[in-house]
Structure formats: C-alpha cells, structure tokens
Amino acid sequence: MRERYLYLADTPQGILMSGQVPEYQFWLLAEISPVHSEKVINALRDYLVMGYNRMEACGRHSVSPGYFSGALKRFQRVSQTVYRLVPFYFPEAGHEVHRGE
C-alpha cells in the first residue's frame, strides 16, 4: 500500500478538515495562499493541524472570528485549486482533468 503524505488525496475535492491536515502540507499551502498575517496563519494552523476549535484558535492568536472565517475560506480555495491541478502533474492520481468549468 502506498503511503500518503498529503491529506488532499483522501478528501473530497481537496477540502481541509480541522485537525486532519499534516503540518508539512499546511506550510506548503500557506506558501501559496493569499493569507499573509502571521497571527491568522498561526490560528489556521491551530485549527487545521492541531485540531483546536475555531474560537480557541482565534483566541490564542487574537484574531477576530469573522476575519478567521474569511481567511479559512481563502485557504480552502487554495487547497481545492491544488486538488484540481494534481492530475496535470500526476495523471495516475485517478481523478479526471477538467478543461474548465
């Protein structure tokens, strides 16, 4: 059985779930995400990697819940885009290449 290092291969359409994202994958996504605030990135890490609930993650890093939700949505969008790119780089990944929506 092939070991999987990236969580997106196991989730529907690249959706990230709280507490289930590997640290390495999180930092790769953070590199290409439009989120630049260190506080928000740390709150997202607490939520996605460490498994804190949204309020705990926001409280630990002094991030407003509304801003956190917007940043999480942008982060999810990056993950979903990466998911759609995978077949262009790894055709054996098993999901179809869509030429547009």
Swiss-Prot record:
Keywords of this entry: Activator, Plasmid, Transcription, Transcription regulation
Gene Ontology biological-process annotations: regulation of DNA-templated transcription
Keyword Transcription regulation: yes
Disulfide topology: none
Function: Regulates the transcription of genes involved in the biosynthesis of afimbrial adhesin-III.
Full protein name: AFA-III adhesin operon regulatory protein
Naturally occurring in which organism (per UniProt): Escherichia coli
Gene (name only): afaA
